Amino acid sequence: MSKLIPVIKVNNLSFYYDTQKILEGVSMEIYQSKVTAIIGPSGCGKSTFLKCLNRMNELESEVRVEGRVEFFNQNIYERRVNLNRLRRQVSMVHPKPNLFPMSVYDNVAYGVKIVGWRPKLEIDDIVESALKDADLWDEIKHKIHKSALDLSGGQQQRLCIARALAVKPKVLLMDEPCFGLDPIASMKVESLIQSLRLRSELTMVIVSHNLSQVSRVSDFTAFFKGNENRIGQLVEFGLTKKMFNSPHDSRTREYVLSRLG
């Protein structure tokens, strides 16, 4: 394996909603150009952890973070951090498509336009490139000026990925990207993740309950589980193949076997 370069370093991270502790003492690294999967039972803080990686958690009220999250060696929780720039560099795709009520083109171009003025021809190229990167161009190139809300659920989710890719992030966070999709649409999203993994330097972090999918698309896996007080903790982190075939912790082994059989 080539040398692993940490893009994100998480050190002793704890997270609170008001006075309720959701995560406790999480430490791990996210490596450049690798896919890291976050797995674990429902309610163990996986999605909360994901949102800690670009401060999306701050969109909710009364939250508190302890510890450090470093993006290329800068603590993202320092006050001087530009949140708009951070969220462009560490972009997120949510479980359900959250498209704007506008055309396919305008959805993809939106993030590009708010960064600063660009000639229309340049934006056209960016939109086309992002749709191609999301394996969507050939399917919808004839209707990019029609409403994005008319697309199928799977196409809408890939459009959300295209919108994220358009601003050239360093890291793409995906929270259950196949949630609610039929098997065919889910497979297309999975194929897209595998394609991005092979042909780009993009770093991806994915929350998923589908361990079969995780085994196919990820390089590393982090297993989270609630403790006796139902506070999410990182139980084990390592190479996906090793985690699934010979985990160190009995709790990891029990969870993987219960999901994969």
From Swiss-Prot:
Gene3D superfamilies: P-loop containing nucleotide triphosphate hydrolases. It is a peripheral membrane protein. Its main location: membrane. It catalyses: phosphate(out) + ATP + H2O = ADP + 2 phosphate(in) + H(+). The keyword NADP does not apply. The keyword Transport applies. GO terms for biological process: phosphate ion transmembrane transport. SMART domains: AAA (SM00382). InterPro entries: AAA+_ATPase, ABC_transporter-like_ATP-bd, ABC_transporter-like_CS, P-loop_NTPase, PstB-like. It is an enzyme of class 7 (translocase). ATP binds at G40, P41, S42, G43, C44, G45, K46, S47. GO terms for molecular function: ATP binding; ATP hydrolysis activity; ATPase-coupled phosphate ion transmembrane transporter activity. One of its GO terms (cellular component) is plasma membrane. Keywords: ATP-binding, Cell inner membrane, Cell membrane, Membrane, Nucleotide-binding, Phosphate transport, Translocase, Transport. It is found in: Cell inner membrane. It holds the Pfam family ABC_tran. It comes from the Bacteria. Part of the ABC transporter complex PstSACB involved in phosphate import. Responsible for energy coupling to the transport system. Belongs to the ABC transporter superfamily. Phosphate importer (TC 3.A.1.7) family. The complex is composed of two ATP-binding proteins (PstB), two transmembrane proteins (PstC and PstA) and a solute-binding protein (PstS). This is Phosphate import ATP-binding protein PstB 1. It comes from Nostoc sp. (strain PCC 7120 / SAG 25.82 / UTEX 2576).
